């Protein structure tokens, strides 16, 4: 029997650490950045197979803390360098990795499903990342999801 995204997220153990959450969502997150596994590997100075192994999940391989830190540095640098076209990436990381406790289960499910819908187009055409990010925000707003923690962070960032 196929389990829904809602069920999977609802049953997520709140004690799961950020390393595990990043590993679980890495394929989607790198797609939101517009990167293939090979592109992320190049940015990290590792082989594509290393990224593929990490993305296979914790049953086959558990990402190390050092790998987590390296991946986060690359992601955070990308967000800082391109704030206008990485909003979707920022919100996905915030909701699924950094602060899932700030979102309801329904909001996380909606964020995940909408990001999965748009992320493949970003990988195919990275120059369309900004328009995909804007479309993602519009879709979330239309579906009634309030990205409260993410919105607060963006508003705070603009004041700085």
Locations of regions flagged by a protein language model:
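Intrinsically disordered, low-complexity tails and linkers flanking structured cores
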Residues: 1-3, 98-160
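A short, Lys/Arg-rich alpha-helix, primarily the initiator
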Residues: 2-32
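Helix-turn-helix DNA-binding elements, focusing on the entry/boundary residues of the two helices
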Residues: 26, 37, 48, 68
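Long, helix-rich, hydrophobic modules that act as membrane-proximal anchors or helical bundle/coiled-coil regulators
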Residues: 27, 34-36, 55-56
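Short alpha-helical "recognition helix" segments of helix-turn-helix
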Residues: 38-42
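Recognition helix of helix-turn-helix/homeodomain-like DNA-binding domains
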Residues: 45-63
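DNA major-groove recognition helix of helix-turn-helix/homeodomain DNA-binding modules
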Residues: 63-83
């Amino acid at each position: 029997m196929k389990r829904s995204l809602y069920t999977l997220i609802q049953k997520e153990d709140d004690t799961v650490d950020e390393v595990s959450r990043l590993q679980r969502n890495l394929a989607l997150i790198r797609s939101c950045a517009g990167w293939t596994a090979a592109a992320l590997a190049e940015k990290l100075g590792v082989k594509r197979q290393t990224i593929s192994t990490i993305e296979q999940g914790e049953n086959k391989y558990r990402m190390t803390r050092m790998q987590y830190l390296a991946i986060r540095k690359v992601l955070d640098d990308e967000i800082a360098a391109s704030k206008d076209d990485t909003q979707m990436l920022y919100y996905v990381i915030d909701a699924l990795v950094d602060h899932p406790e700030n979102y309801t289960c329904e909001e996380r499910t909606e964020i995940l499903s909408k990001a999965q819908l748009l992320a493949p187009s970003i990988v195919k055409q990275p120059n369309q990342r900004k328009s995909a990010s804007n479309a993602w925000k519009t879709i979330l707003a239309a579906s009634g999801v309030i990205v409260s923690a993410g919105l607060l962070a963006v508003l705070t960032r603009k004041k700085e």
